[in-house]
């Protein structure tokens, strides 16, 4: 069938299989063109492996370091006239290319928050690898979590804490810049968001992997966070998500102590750059900030996407054969170029004057839109979008599909 983008709010409800495959191919080619990673990881588990930073780290591990990878995610296969979710197509393309290159790549589709999926993953690691996982990437962005022990359902929200937040935001599809007010979160919303986006599940994963002897001596585990400039702090760093991320950082310190004493291992937080992802598109204010950031970083020739960010994380931080450089809080900073004083000063200056009339010229909102569509496989060169495509794509390592996630 012919697949066109259908955008509702900040979500595109369709995905293009060939476009997603082309996008993954571009990332793989980038990783292959870099100098090979010496002393890189050999057996990598990526939790949240199908899009964004998770997918990019899987590609860098596989095609940059020749690592075997197992990816866990919750994606939807095609059904009837409904396309699969982008992460499904991404993984189908990744596995196919990895297998053709002689690389081990298997995936598990299901709720990473559940005990069942953790057990399935552990069984696969024991059966195929006999343990020895030397890198665990934790990259989950989810709106809800069912607690595996209590069955309690938590929903995450993006809200400020304490007082109503007033600023401006942009509708990226129309380019309309308008004022936005966001009501503060309740105590329950703060706790719920921490339960979904904090470090609780990361710790459950690492503890389970450790208990079943799946981790190698010297193992590293990395989770991702974002700090950003003061401009976004009220809605992000000082809001509900920021509170959850503080919990994630606290978890990193606890896991680091455990892994260090048991396996001479490390648990680390990587502070990444602001990028167009399905998750960031949902945050008010942030798309306008990213549109300005893209323009300035591109002008200064320091713009990076997910794959460039993950390459730099592996090459210059995790596997540089030096001590891993961190900030005063022990975090890896690959948001260093975004947070450069000259970049932030320019954004601050433009922020005051940006409006509907000048947003297309002052910012790179066109680049934002382009990246947004690319997440779903649209707008890629060399794809004929008027031609019908087969929307059912198999992921080689997945035979049965679980209940469709919403």
Swiss-Prot record:
InterPro entries: Eno_Rdtase_FAD-bd_dom, Enoyl-CoA_Rdtase_cat_dom, FabV-like_NADH_b, Trans-2-enoyl-CoA_reductase
EC number from the UniProt entry: 1.3.1.9
Keywords linked to the UniProt accession: Fatty acid biosynthesis, Fatty acid metabolism, Lipid biosynthesis, Lipid metabolism, NAD, Oxidoreductase
Pathway stated in the Swiss-Prot or TrEMBL entry: Lipid metabolism; fatty acid biosynthesis
GO terms for biological process, alphabetical: fatty acid biosynthetic process
Enzyme class of the recorded protein, top EC level: oxidoreductase
Domain of life: Bacteria
Active site (catalytic residues): 236
GO molecular function, one term: enoyl-[acyl-carrier-protein] reductase (NADH) activity
Reactions catalysed, as given in the entry: a 2,3-saturated acyl-[ACP] + NAD(+) = a (2E)-enoyl-[ACP] + NADH + H(+)
Binding-site positions, substrate: 226
Site (Plays an important role in discriminating NADH against NADPH): 75
Pfam families membership: Eno-Rase_FAD_bd, Eno-Rase_NADH_b, Enoyl_reductase
Positions of NAD(+) binding: 48-53, 74-75, 111-112, 140-141, 245, 275-277
Keyword Lipid metabolism part of the UniProt annotation: yes
PANTHER family in the record: ENOYL-[ACYL-CARRIER-PROTEIN] REDUCTASE [NADH] (PTHR37480:SF1)
Oligomer and partners: Monomer.
Family the entry assigns: Belongs to the TER reductase family.
Role according to the record: Involved in the final reduction of the elongation cycle of fatty acid synthesis (FAS II). Catalyzes the reduction of a carbon-carbon double bond in an enoyl moiety that is covalently linked to an acyl carrier protein (ACP).
Protein name as catalogued: Enoyl-[acyl-carrier-protein] reductase [NADH]
Organism in which the protein naturally occurs: Coxiella burnetii (strain CbuG_Q212) (Coxiella burnetii (strain Q212))
Lineage: Bacteria, Pseudomonadati, Pseudomonadota, Gammaproteobacteria, Legionellales
């Amino acid at each position: 069938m012919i697949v066109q983008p259908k955008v509702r709010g900040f979500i595109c409800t369709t995905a293009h299989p060939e476009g997603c495959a082309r996008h993954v191919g571009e990332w793989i080619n980038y990783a292959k063109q870099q100098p090979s990673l010496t002393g890189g990881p050999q057996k990598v588990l990526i939790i949240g492996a199908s899009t964004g930073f998770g997918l990019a780290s899987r590609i860098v591990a596989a095609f940059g370091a020749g690592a075997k990878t197992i990816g866990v995610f919750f994606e939807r296969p095609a059904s009837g006239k409904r396309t699969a979710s982008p992460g499904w197509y991404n993984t189908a393309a990744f596995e196919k290319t990895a297998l053709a290159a002689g690389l081990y790549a298997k995936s598990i589709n299901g709720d990473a928050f559940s005990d069942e999926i953790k057990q399935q993953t552990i069984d696969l690691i024991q059966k195929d690898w006999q343990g020895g996982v030397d890198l665990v990437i934790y990259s989950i962005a989810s709106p809800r979590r069912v607690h595996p022990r209590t069955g309690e359902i938590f929903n995450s929200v993006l809200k400020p804490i304490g007082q109503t937040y007033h600023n401006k935001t942009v509708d990226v599809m129309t380019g309309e810049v308008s004022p936005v007010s966001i009501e503060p979160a309740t105590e329950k919303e703060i706790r719920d968001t921490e339960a979904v986006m904090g470090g609780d599940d990361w710790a459950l994963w690492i503890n389970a992997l450790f208990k079943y002897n799946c981790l190698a001596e010297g193992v590293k585990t990395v989770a991702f966070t974002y700090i950003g400039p003061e401009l976004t702090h009220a809605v992000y760093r000082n809001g509900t998500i920021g509170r959850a991320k503080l919990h994630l950082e606290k978890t990193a310190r606890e896991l680091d102590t455990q892994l260090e004493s048991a396996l001479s291992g490390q648990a680390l937080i990587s502070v990444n750059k602001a990028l167009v992802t399905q998750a960031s598109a949902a945050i008010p204010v942030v798309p306008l900030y990213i549109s300005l950031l893209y323009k300035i970083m591109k002008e200064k020739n320091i713009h990076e996407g997910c794959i460039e960010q993950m390459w730099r994380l592996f090459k210059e931080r995790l596997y540089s054969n030096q001590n891993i450089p961190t900030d005063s809080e022990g975090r890896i900073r690959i948001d260093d170029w975004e947070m450069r004083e000259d970049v932030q000063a320019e954004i601050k200056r433009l922020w005051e004057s940006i409006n509907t009339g000048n947003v297309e010229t002052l910012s790179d909102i066109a680049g934002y839109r382009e990246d947004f569509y690319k997440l779903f496989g649209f707008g890629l060169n060399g794809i004929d979008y008027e031609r019908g495509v087969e929307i059912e794509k198999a992921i080689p390592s997945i035979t049965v599909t679980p209940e469709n996630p919403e």
